[in-house]
């Protein structure tokens, strides 16, 4: 017996290696027949009769191809595996029944991805499995589909996630068929009656279904144990992941979801979607048969529509234009319960904790966190007093509550007094008929500067204005009358926007034209300087005699002669706004025009931040009534209690008629790139 093997071992070792490689290939081809063939002497194939194995360092030895993913046993042993299942190593060790793909450590951004979605071997069966997408489920549990043992222990080791598309029907309704248009876009044929809509899937004592998919027959699966819908299922959003160049299905799903959210972001919302205010979809679930009463297709009017979102009946609960008399289908969030004090109201525990994401061009209004299926009226659709009345009564007519959006929350939580009349910007385009007379206003500015300032400072201001005069001429020489009228309309429209900003901002703010005329002023600026808004805008005569001279506070006389302007004296019937140069002292005016010459046609986004001295508004009577003891008394008040309230702000600069401030200003240009207005913000230096 020992002599025969020695004689058989006489051939060259290459013959043994060839025989071993053939045996390995044969075993890989018959992976589904796990058995080990042995020679007559009890020695396994692939090894010689004397127990010697092929030399692993032999260059002629066939190399194994590296597997895409090792099995669980080879992964733990850090050994080379193969693509076949069961692999050769598990077959030799007798572990062929437990040979399955190992699970790799997922990246952080994939930690919430199901393991099945990351397995490359089941790319065509995880999402597009016809068994998974076409299993109907009756509520009485009469139809149950049991998977065989070979299917449960075959290619898919991990059970399919609980995202099977179940269609719940009443016992009195026949089971519908499910023809699929595409593997990722099933067409739902649903037939129901109003009676069926009144039954909630989350009502009393729901019977758990008896259908088990890819699992043991005796182990029931509860569809309510998982989430309401599977966000990792591309069929929910009509994704074609096979067309995306991603090795990882979850990465492709994330990319497709971002594209789905961005789809239609710039489109104008449709009438039905705007009124419905619900989440828009491009349609992965369509009604192909008789529609449910009160729930037509997405393109119909929302007056009798019940949106069917994400192909899940449980998410059939969304604000819609449901009529009060129609039966209501409760859904995810119960409307009333044992803990609810008011029927029909969401309890605190049941309310959602986040705003819904608008995934399509359905509406530009933010869905509210307190929205419910019965909230069918938005703030934009009802008068303001009706929303307040609904809040005070607790219940709206027909037991409905108005849909609370972000603007309505702002209005209802704040104590709103008399409502301001809504301004219409269209009136600007109707009222402006003539171009603004910038030439005459520049002449008025020049006359004022010559009348107030000494020759030296007048020359400095003139040089600054002369440096930008060629630019003004070059930009305006091609403009005709229509262009100048359009320029004034642009100015008034921009000023219309700034007025709301000034009223909402607590900083002393003024807006001037490029000539320096005051065009808009905030309340805080009037409190700080004493200049009334009507005086600054030219609606009342300007009786100020404070020019910032050295003899001003005590004597009441100016350092030079100055005749106060009034709208009647100069140009009868025409408003004469105050120039910015009348609000600043001499040095501040010179500094302003030097900075304006650099910024007017320079950096369009530039700004200037520096200090200045604002002149208080004082008439001749104010100057005569001012006494030194009053000034001393006010200074003592500052040392004791400081500045408080509007009266304290108004008394700043009482001593010398000047308020030292830090201010920041910038230049805004029009469509012709010409300086249009100057926006200035002041903060007093206390």
UniProtKB/Swiss-Prot annotation:
Composition skew (Polar residues), residue ranges: 177-222, 269-292, 362-378, 403-415, 544-570
BP GO terms, sorted: cellular response to starvation; gluconeogenesis; positive regulation of metabolic process
Predominant localisation class: nucleus
Molecular function terms from GO: DNA-binding transcription factor activity, RNA polymerase II-specific; RNA polymerase II transcription regulatory region sequence-specific DNA binding; zinc ion binding
Single GO cellular component term: nucleus
Classification via PANTHER family: TRANSCRIPTION ACTIVATOR OF GLUCONEOGENESIS ERT1 (PTHR47659:SF1), ZN(II)2CYS6 TRANSCRIPTION FACTOR (EUROFUNG)-RELATED (PTHR47659)
Similarity comment text for this entry: Belongs to the ERT1/acuK family.
Role noted for this protein: Transcription factor which regulates nonfermentable carbon utilization. Activator of gluconeogenetic genes.
Protein name in the entry: Transcription activator of gluconeogenesis acuK
Organism annotation: Aspergillus niger (strain ATCC MYA-4892 / CBS 513.88 / FGSC A1513)
């Amino acid at each position: 017996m020992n002599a025969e093997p020695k004689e058989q071992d006489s051939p060259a070792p290459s013959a043994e290696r060839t025989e071993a490689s053939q045996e390995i290939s044969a075993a890989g081809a018959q992976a589904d027949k796990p058995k080990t063939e042995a020679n007559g002497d009890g020695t396994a194939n692939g090894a010689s009769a004397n127990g010697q194995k092929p030399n692993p360092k032999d260059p002629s030895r066939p190399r194994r191809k590296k597997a895409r993913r090792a099995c669980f046993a080879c992964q733990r042993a850090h050994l080379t595996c193969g693509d076949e299942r069961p692999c050769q190593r598990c077959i030799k060790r007798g572990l062929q029944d437990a040979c399955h793909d190992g699970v790799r450590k997922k990246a952080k951004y994939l930690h919430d991805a199901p393991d099945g979605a990351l397995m490359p071997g089941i790319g065509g069966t995880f999402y597009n499995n016809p068994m998974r997408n076409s299993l109907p489920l009756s509520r009485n549990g009469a139809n149950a589909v049991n998977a065989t043992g070979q299917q449960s222990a075959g290619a898919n080791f991990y059970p399919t996630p609980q995202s099977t598309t179940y269609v719940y029907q009443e016992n009195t309704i026949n089971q519908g068929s499910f023809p699929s248009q595409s593997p990722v876009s099933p067409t739902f044929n649903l037939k129901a009656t109003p009676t069926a809509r009144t039954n909630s899937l989350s009502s009393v004592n729901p019977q758990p279904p008896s259908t088990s998919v890819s699992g043991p027959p005796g182990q029931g699966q509860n569809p309510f144990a998982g989430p309401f819908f599977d966000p990792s299922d591309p069929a929910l959003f009509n994704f074609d992941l096979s067309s995306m160049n991603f090795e990882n299905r979850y990465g492709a799903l994330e990319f497709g979801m971002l594209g789905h959210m961005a789809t239609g972001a710039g489109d104008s919302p449709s009438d039905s979607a705007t009124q419905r205010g619900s989440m828009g979809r491009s349609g992965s679930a369509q009604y192909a048969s008789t529609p449910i009463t009160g729930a037509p297709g997405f393109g119909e009017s929302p007056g009798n529509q019940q949106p069917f979102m994400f192909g899940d009946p449980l998410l059939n609960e969304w604000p819609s234009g449901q009529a009060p008399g129609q039966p209501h289908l409760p859904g995810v969030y119960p409307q009333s319960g044992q803990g609810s004090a008011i029927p029909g109201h969401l309890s605190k525990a049941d309310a959602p904790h986040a705003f819904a994401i608008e995934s399509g061009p359905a509406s530009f209004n933010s869905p509210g966190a307190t929205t419910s299926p019965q909230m069918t009226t938005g703030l934009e659709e009802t008068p303001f007093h009706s929303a307040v009345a609904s809040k005070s009564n607790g219940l709206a007519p027909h037991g409905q509550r108005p849909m609370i959006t972000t603007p309505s929350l702002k209005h209802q939580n704040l104590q709103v007094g008399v409502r301001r009349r809504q301004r219409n910007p269209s009136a600007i385009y109707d009222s402006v008929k003539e171009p603004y007379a910038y030439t005459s206003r520049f002449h008025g500015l020049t006359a004022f500067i010559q009348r107030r300032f000494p020759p030296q400072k007048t020359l400095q201001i003139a040089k600054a204005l002369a440096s930008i005069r060629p630019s003004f001429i070059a930009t305006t020489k091609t403009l005709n009358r229509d262009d100048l009228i359009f320029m004034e309309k642009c100015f008034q429209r921009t000023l219309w926007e700034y007025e709301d900003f000034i009223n909402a901002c607590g900083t002393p703010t003024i807006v001037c034209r490029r000539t320096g005329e005051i065009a808009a002023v905030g309340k805080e600026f009037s409190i700080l300087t004493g200049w009334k808004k009507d005086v600054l805008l030219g609606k009342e005569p300007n009786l100020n005699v404070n020019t910032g001279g050295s003899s001003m506070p005590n004597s009441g006389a100016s350092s030079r002669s100055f005749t106060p302007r009034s709208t009647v004296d100069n140009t009868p019937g025409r408003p004469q706004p105050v120039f910015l140069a009348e609000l600043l002292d001499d040095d501040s005016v010179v500094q302003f025009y030097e900075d304006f010459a650099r910024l007017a046609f320079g950096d369009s986004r530039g700004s200037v931040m520096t200090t200045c001295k604002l002149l208080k508004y004082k008439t001749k009577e104010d100057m005569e009534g001012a006494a030194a003891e009053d000034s001393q008394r006010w200074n003592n008040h500052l040392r004791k209690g400081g500045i408080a309230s509007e009266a304290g702000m108004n008394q700043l600069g009482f001593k010398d008629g000047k308020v030292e401030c830090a201010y920041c200003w910038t230049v805004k240009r029009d469509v012709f790139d010409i300086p249009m207005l100057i926006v200035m913000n002041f903060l007093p230096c206390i």
